Amino acid sequence: MPAQPSGYRPEMPGLSYNNNMKGWGPELCARRPDITMAMVDTFLTNMYGGARADFVYTVTRDFVRNCQTPILVLPDDVPGHPYAVAMETVHLAPNAQVSFYPWKDTPDKIPLAVRHIRTFLRAHRPVAAARSMAAAAQ
C-alpha cells in the first residue's frame, strides 16, 4: 500500500483542524443539511486532537508497529504531510519501504517515484491476482 502519511506538525498544531473548519466543514454542511458545524467540530476535534495529536491522525503507533501489510512510504514535507511523521512510520512498520525524498520537486523525479510505486505493487500483488494474471498470459 503506497502511503503519504498525514500527521501532526508541532510547529503548526491547529493546521488540519483549522483548514477543515474553514474549507471542508462548511462545504459538507452545504451539501448535507443533516450535518451541522457543531458535528463537524466534534468530528475534527476527535480526529486531530487528543492521543492522535502527535503522530498519524488515523492510527496509533501501536497499530503501525503491528501492521503486517507491506507499505511504501513516499515522504513529503508540506504542512499536512510532515517528513518526521513519514520517517517514524517507516521505522515503526515492520514491512515498510521508503521511497526517495524529495520525489516531486522536479518533473524528472516523478517518473522515478511512479516506477518505484509500480515495482512495489507488483512485488506485493495478492497471490490470487498474480495467479489469474499468469494464467491469462499463458
Stretches with model-predicted labels:
Residues 1-11:
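Active-site nucleophile loop of the alpha/beta-hydrolase fold
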Residues 64-68, 91-94:
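Short, conserved loop/helix-junction motifs that constitute active-site signature segments
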Residues 66-67, 73-75:
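Short beta-strand/loop motif that positions the catalytic acidic residue
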